[in-house]
Amino acid sequence: MQLFSIYLFYYLYLKMEKFVVFGRYCEDAIIKREPFREQHLKRLKNLKNSDILVTLGPTKCAKYLFGIFNANDVNELKDLFEEDIYWEKGIWINYDIYPWIQAF
């Protein structure tokens, strides 16, 4: 049974597409995000452990965000992104999602 679960996981994982996300933070995001940061990071850790999140973070200037995700389609990722506390509280103010083909 465990072998089947592992096989199923990798089958579903390989069927998922990769997406890149580019977005923008609100003004003074470093300060405004503080009350929500712990909840946000806990959620990201769960997404990372589930192999949905590959990487996510701000650019050095802290005006933009960049992420790579695994999802079945754009709508699934859009829903997932908008469930984040940073989106709900206006820390992230816009984003674009692009299907991505990992060359190597």
Where do the PLM segments sit?
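Short, Lys/Arg-enriched N-terminal segments with co-localized hydrophobic residues
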Residues: 2-15
